[in-house]
Every structure is written in C-alpha cells, then in structure tokens.
Amino acid sequence: MRNVIVLIDSGYLGAASCIILSNWGAAWGTWKSGIGLCSMGVNHPGGIIKNLVAIIMAGVLGIYGLIVAIIISGGISKPAYDKNTYSEFTGWAHMAAGLCCGLCNLAAGGATGIAGEYGIKATGHRAELNHAKNNKNMMGNVSSEVGDEGDAARLYIGSVTILSFSGAIGLYGFILSLIITSSDAYECV
C-alpha cells in the first residue's frame, strides 16, 4: 500500500509543480513587463495599449500550466482495495510532464518579463523623442538631427519578435508535456 501512495504522490506532485511553476513564471513576466509599462506610461501614455502584448503573453503561460495540471490530475487513478491501478511508469511520466511544463514556463516568464520591460521602455522613449523632435520642427526651429520617424515602429516590431521567441520556450514545454501525458499508460499486473 505504501508504494501505491508514493506513486500517486509523484503524479500529484507533477500536477502541483506544473501549476505552481507556470504561474510563478506568468507572475514574474507580468510583474517585470508591468514595471516597464508603468514607467513608459508616464512619458508616453499613447503607447500603453499596444505595449500590453508582453503582459498578455506572460499570462498565457499560466494557462498552459493549468491545462497540463488538469490533464495530469485527470490521469491519476485511485487505488482499489490494496491493488495498484496507477503504474510507476505513469506516475513518473506525470511528474516529468509537470516539471517540463512548469520549468519551461518559469524560464519563459522570466525571459518575457525582462525582454518586455526593456522593450516597452525603449519603445516609449523612442516615441517620446520622435514626438519632441516633431514639435520642435513645427515651431519653426530647424533640427540638425536627421531622424527616422519609423524608429519607434521598428523597435516595437523587434520587441514583439523577441517576446514571441521567449514565449515559444513555454509553448515547447507545453507541447512536450502533452506528448508525455498522452503516451500509453502501462497497466499494473
């Protein structure tokens, strides 16, 4: 009976680690990106809505963890009268799937948060500089600087590209966890 409890615990530990680590990564990414958004919003409030992408991408990581944790906990079978119905292979597979998804989402949350914070700040700063330069030129002053009006847009596209690749880390863990949990479960003999 003790082996049965240990095996079931490894499955539930996989589900718990998946949801905890994934939401930790989502919270980390939201926190860091939110700092950048608040900082940028002071000087360039017009860019707040389009720069919500980093926060939304960080929140998706928590959803990945929730989905995998539900699948894992649904695959855990209860023991029946001293008979083990949950194999050791399945227990460790559930543990591996939970850790894979959770740790990948934790890493993706950190990458999304850091890239999001600095990308948002840089985009807002560049847009503010372009706006100030346009106002200066409209007042009749000739600027000696030759600037490109598309700098802020190019910087934003680059930032979103970096965020997409950092979010892909979490997606890879999510897909691998789904593959691991969908593998054939061995029945106990």
Label the model's feature ranges.
Residues M1-V189:
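Hydrophobic, small-residue-rich transmembrane alpha-helices and their short perimembrane loops
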